[in-house]
């Protein structure tokens, strides 16, 4: 569902050429996800990254949550290399924003250890620790009221009126992520297996694609169930569903149902109106929506029906762009996104700034994430 990652060497070489003429002070944006750690260096007064670097492999997660030591092992050398390539070796970093998948539930060690470690190693004066849904929001919408649906292997919707956050789904492939890549892929494989068995709701077209991708249908359980990356394997079949949707009604129906789930999540988190009574902005971000018209056409229809007051906007940037923009806003004292103890935390701010709330789609009362 995601684009191939560049090697650290090729990314670093490109960064040196791009960033040589830009002066500091500098900020760092960091995106830590399932496919690895990405780092962007930017100037406080700039808009685009000065340089970027991709680190190989994801940050480890253990019994204590996301491993702060392992994150630092990747982040610190990358940051120093980027500074060196910009002719600023030894310079301090004004602000850092780190967005991480699982930050809300698995980020306790990061919140405990990173503030002091980054200050000691890089002279970081200001730090923001955010969930990856928040950096996706910042990258797509910025610091305006609105809503973002981030779709890839999973699916999560996040919205804010700039006083609190609202979240819908993002509960993983066993409890939710309805309409996401793994959900679509699993539904497509279910239809294929139904066709193999002769049960109602089967799709011969999807059975043919299953056999082309995975081999004989009866062998699929033995291939799938031992895998530790089952959501990604399921999601890998989602493009096959999209490819069949133009001529197979079962595949088209799966994508219509996925679109309904995505629109439902967006509806749950979208503020009633933007600033000054403007329509709520809704952005779609992530690899899921690169499947094109088979998903986007029914999704636009569902969003228009459920959110007639909303305005669809193109996402202006990805989570790494969002992390860098949060770091810049933090450095200039202009971070307007609502704080939350686990969703967007700025260590050193008063407790009243960290006490923001998150509401879920089932409950309009504020609840902790």
Task: Indicate residue ranges for each PLM-predicted region.
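ATP-binding/phosphotransfer module of carbohydrate and carboxylate kinases, centering on a glycine-rich
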Residues: 2-92, 139-145, 189-369
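Glycine-rich beta-strand-to-loop/alpha-helix junction loops that act as flexible
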Residues: 97-103, 151-153, 280-291
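Phosphate-binding/catalytic loop of phosphoryl-transfer enzymes
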Residues: 103-203, 343-345, 351-353, 366
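Short acidic capping loops at alpha-helix termini that bridge into adjacent secondary structure
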Residues: 90-94, 125-126
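Membrane helical hairpin/interfacial module
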Residues: 78, 94, 101-105
